[in-house]
Structures are given as structure tokens and as C-alpha cells.
Design a protein with these regions (language model features):
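Catalytic histidine-centered segment of alpha/beta-hydrolase-like enzymes
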Residues: 279-292
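Active-site loop/oxyanion-hole signature of alpha/beta-hydrolase fold enzymes
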Residues: 37, 69, 73-74, 80, ...
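Conserved HGGG/HGGXW glycine-rich cap/lid loop of the alpha/beta-hydrolase fold
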Residues: 43-89, 303
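A short loop-to-beta-strand scaffold at the N-terminal edge of the catalytic core in hydrolase folds
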Residues: 35-44
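Conserved alpha/beta-hydrolase catalytic His-Asp/Glu region
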Residues: 174-229
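Catalytic histidine neighborhood in serine/cysteine hydrolases
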Residues: 268-281
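Conserved hydrolase catalytic core segment
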Residues: 116-156
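Conserved serine/cysteine hydrolase catalytic core
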Residues: 207-266, 275
Length: 321
């Protein structure tokens, strides 16, 4: 009897695991922009469930959010990730003249393709695009907003350090190990072996056989040209946001500081703030588990129509608020 029961339990566990894997499996498609580029869009989870839309940071791609998207899809969310223009598998501008408005419009295009306004989770650049879209667009394009280590103002030295890293290898890398060495020097807190697959998603092999970052180098000119001049606009947009907001910051971030967080919370008094003490600017990648713990209570406080029943039930079972 015991052996039969053990076998049934094992079969039940395997069936649940297969169901979770099938639910979290990614579906890749493309979506046209207003100016006829194609955006690479990846979805996970039931398409009729409440949606979470992930927007990646500058120089990243949709793969930066893969683990977080898989986790939410397994809990019943419709998780959507996409490559911003000029990044990953999305289209690039022939003239290389990227502008903030284009990125915001692309974000709104993806959001409006969904059945209802999604929760937006935006890291760095993705969070800034979310701020502009949420603060300058009515009706509200998002059900709620999660900003990941970004505020309307930022510490310039941290941004310059990031840009220096991105400019440092114009001729690419001979191997994945060489690229890993470069990232390890810039992000020593990362566990190198664990990140090799994710690192490979950020690179592409050119005709000369060398590996280069999977984004348009012309984007660096855009940041240098437009960067800080948008900060007042971003702060004004933040003051206009009336949906629930969560700011998740890294305690070791060199881009977000106590001062920039305080200014943001004064501008958006209803916003909540969670700090992950050991994390840097790349906090979701530094510790995805800690990031998930930080955002889950916020997601469960949204109204019932915005939270999958399976996610809310799981949260209650674990004693989350």
C-alpha cells in the first residue's frame, strides 16, 4: 500500500511540474510599431489571465526578465516580455536616431495589445519609460507600476560607469569566456557560472566570428544626447501617477541613492518602497529570489480582478499580506 501511495504521489508531483513547465513555456511573436519596426514579444502563462508586462533596462533584452516571468506565469499570471527597439531581436533604426518618445510609444503599443491594462515592471530604462507613459497618458495604460532601481533623477557617476562599460568593447569578444571576464569585472557580485546562459542571450556573433552585445551601438549616442535633459519631465510625470506604485531599490546601487529615493517618494506619496540591501543596480539579476519576495506582497494587494486566483491562494498559504 505504501509503495502504491508513494508512486501516486510521485506521479502527482510530476504532473504538477509538467503543468507548471507548460504554463511557463515562452511563446515568441513579433509586433509592428507605428514606424514599421518589429518588436520581439514573448509571452508566458494563460493569455486570459491578468497580465504583468516587463520592460528591460538599457543594453539588456527580454531575456533579462526570463526567470521572473517564468515564476509569475507558474502562479497564474500572463507574463509578457519584449525587446525594446534597437535591442535583442527587435528592429533597429537605419539612421540610428532613437528618441524617448519612440520607446514610450512602443511600450504603449505592447501594453494596449493586452486585454486589460497590465502591471508594468520596469528596470532602469524600462522604468523610466513606464514613468512617462503612466504620467502622461490617460486613461491609465497600466494597472500598477513597479520601478526597479530607477527614479526620475539618478546619480550621474553611476550612469557614466555603466556607459563606460558599454563603450569598452567596440570590437566584441573572441569567446563567451572573454565576455564573462568583462562582466565579472563590472559586476563582481554576480555568480559567473550561473550567468553564462543569460550572458549568451545578450550577445550575437558577427560575420567576423566575434561576439558583440545584442544592441545597436547607436543607442549610446542617444543616451549621451538625451540623458539628463529629461529629468524634469520624468519628475513631472511621476507627480501625475495615480495607480499603485512600488519602488524596489538596491542598497548597493550606484544609480539610485537615498536622496533620489526621497525625492521620488515626496513626488509620489502613495508609492511604496522596498530596499534589497545587498543588491546593486542590476538587482533582479543579482538575486532573483529576493526580487520576487519584494514584489509579491505588492502584487497580492491589488484588487481581485488584477490578481490570478492561484497566485492569491498561494500567497495566503504562505502567510503573505
Amino acid at each position: 500500500y505504501c509503495s502504491v501511495l508513494t508512486g501516486l504521489r510521485r506521479k502527482s508531483i510530476l504532473m504538477r511540474m509538467e503543468k507548471i513547465e507548460a504554463t511557463a513555456a515562452a511563446r515568441l511573436t513579433t509586433m509592428p510599431t507605428r514606424d514599421d519596426l518589429r518588436l520581439a514579444v514573448e509571452t508566458r502563462g494563460p493569455i486570459d489571465a491578468p497580465a504583468v508586462l516587463f520592460a528591460h533596462g538599457f543594453g539588456q533584452s527580454r531575456h533579462a526578465w526570463a526567470r521572473a516571468a517564468e515564476g509569475l506565469a507558474a502562479h497564474g499570471w500572463h507574463a509578457v516580455t519584449f525587446d525594446a527597439r534597437g535591442h535583442g531581436d527587435s528592429g533597429r533604426l537605419a539612421d540610428g536616431r532613437y528618441a524617448l518618445e519612440q520607446f514610450v510609444d512602443d511600450l504603449l503599443t505592447v501594453a494596449r495589445s493586452l486585454a486589460a491594462p497590465p502591471v508594468l515592471v520596469g528596470a532602469s530604462m524600462g522604468g523610466l519609460l513606464g514613468l512617462v507613459a503612466a504620467g502622461e497618458t490617460r486613461p491609465d495604460p497600466f494597472r500598477a507600476l513597479v520601478l526597479v532601481d530607477i527614479t526620475p533623477r539618478w546619480e550621474s557617476e553611476g550612469v557614466e560607469r555603466m556607459l563606460d562599460f558599454m563603450r569598452a568593447h567596440p570590437h566584441g569578444f573572441a569567446s563567451l569566456d572573454d565576455a564573462a571576464d568583462a562582466v565579472a569585472a563590472y559586476l563582481p557580485q554576480r555568480r559567473r557560472r550561473k550567468d553564462r546562459y543569460e550572458l549568451a542571450q545578450l550577445l550575437h556573433r558577427g560575420e567576423d566570428g566575434r561576439l558583440r552585445w545584442h544592441w545597436d551601438p547607436a543607442l549610446l549616442d542617444t543616451v549621451a544626447r538625451e540623458g539628463e535633459r529629461h529629468q524634469q519631465r520624468l519628475l513631472k510625470a511621476a507627480r501625475n501617477i495615480d495607480v499603485p506604485v512600488l519602488l524596489v531599490s538596491g542598497g548597493r546601487s550606484d544609480i539610485v541613492s537615498d536622496a533620489t529615493v526621497a525625492e521620488f517618494l515626496q513626488a509620489v506619496p502613495h508609492a511604496r518602497h522596498v530596499e534589497i540591501p545587498h543588491a546593486t543596480h542590476t538587482l533582479a539579476g543579482d538575486d532573483n529570489a529576493a526580487f520576487a519576495v519584494a514584489i509579491e506582497p505588492f502584487l497580492t494587494t491589488l484588487d481581485p480582478d488584477a490578481v490570478p486566483a492561484s497566485h492569491a491562494h498561494a500567497a495566503v498559504q504562505r502567510g503573505l499580506p
